[in-house]
Amino acid sequence: MTLNLDRPAPLRPKTQPKVGIVSLGCPKALVDSERIITRLRAEGYQIAPDYAGADLVLVNTCGFLDSARDESLAAIGEAIEANGKVIVTGCLGAEPEVIQRAHPKVLAVTGPHQYEAVMDAVHTHLTPPHNPHMDLVPESGLRLTPRHYAYLKISEGCNNRCSFCIIPKLRGDLASRPIHHVLMEAEKLVAAGVKELLVISQDTSAYGLDIRYKPETWRGSEYETRFLDLAKGLGSLGVWTRMHYVYPYPHVDNVIPLMAEGLITPYLDIPFQHASAPVLKAMKRPGNQDKVLGRIAKWREQVPDLAIRSTFIVGFPGETEEDFQILLDFIREAKIDRAGCFKYENVAHAESGKLEGHVPEEVKEERWHRFMTAQAEVSAARAEAQVGRTLDVIIDGPGEEAGEMIARTQADAPEVDAVVYLENAAHLKAGDIIRAEITGADDYDLYATPA
């Protein structure tokens, strides 16, 4: 942790001290923010809804892409201007000199998942209440997501060394949480009303590798700290469970039967990033197009409704038109249900910035539009195939039209995927899971009525 030695004396509010929090970046950072606010509330701090009502502001930053770094620095500046007392944490906090050079008035800077350092910084600059109010904190902790779904982080860091990524430099190597800790947390979340668990990490399929799949006991049974046993344990809780950030390793095949049994939601988030062998090699990513296509076909033989979400990068250094055509052919043949596409940009300290053959910005832009057009065609065909079917959907909340609710199928994760516009549904509430008759579709979203 880096402190500003010219800091003012700590505040000692006459009422309960209030901390504002700004959470940027991915769901993994959101989980970090949830853990921090849980600790703050456990010690009696209030969480302020805005800058004006806060005695101090905590900014949880992202530092993965240059655009994310710029957004984080802008958010820090906004917090300083609006409040004046700012502590910075998160991925960009791993480079304190960058933050302090841009914003010398920050009170302290801590790195990612340094919860104790964050609390120490808060204590230094905002005196904690005399009597902690532990009873104010629910057993499941405090969350920044709606009541009916929650992110479940199973590990920190990553052992992969993708040439475009600096996550291992920011968050370190893979560090898996003990499986009984993860399953107990999931159990508490379900008891608190969560209907959907979203399993996240940097590499979910590598879970447990760093601790040699150490066995632990949960509910009287032994579970090894590995992807398959995690899926079995979570599948016993009776809620929707999504697996995010899964690499296409062979052992992922073992989880597909659990989806066929209805224990795990038939959904895999696999960041393929590309399909061309030369580009994947330059990215230092695993993947063989023919093998991957064959495995996807086998998965869908077992689970016809399996939805696959992925992310891709276009315009990676050295990417040729032929490479790009291979990528387009792949998303069409694999029938990728949901896809995010990003134009390559250099990341500070990433190896890819040193590669030859950087693609001009106008070519990146043109390829991005072609990718999105091709993906829209795939998604539209997948969506149209649902019309006339009756599917389970989970309610997220009210829509803009009278009597309308926004819902999702099992093929759609919150925030990033498609939605279902459910008519005549005013009697339903967030978290309800119902059967819905699909009456229409557009490129991505569905339209339905309660069955």
UniProtKB/Swiss-Prot annotation:
Residues binding [4Fe-4S] cluster 1, per UniProt: C26, C62, C91
Disulfide-bond pairs as recorded: none
Name recorded for this polypeptide: Ribosomal protein uS12 methylthiotransferase RimO
Location(s) in or outside the cell: Cytoplasm
Naturally occurring in which organism (per UniProt): Hyphomonas neptunium (strain ATCC 15444)
MTTase N-terminal domain ranges (all copies): 17-127
Catalytic activity: L-aspartate(89)-[ribosomal protein uS12]-hydrogen + (sulfur carrier)-SH + AH2 + 2 S-adenosyl-L-methionine = 3-methylsulfanyl-L-aspartate(89)-[ribosomal protein uS12]-hydrogen + (sulfur carrier)-H + 5'-deoxyadenosine + L-methionine + A + S-adenosyl-L-homocysteine + 2 H(+)
Positions of [4Fe-4S] cluster 2 binding: C158, C162, C165
Enzyme class: transferase
Any one Gene Ontology cellular component term annotated for this protein: cytosol
Main location: cytoplasm
Protein encoded by which gene: rimO
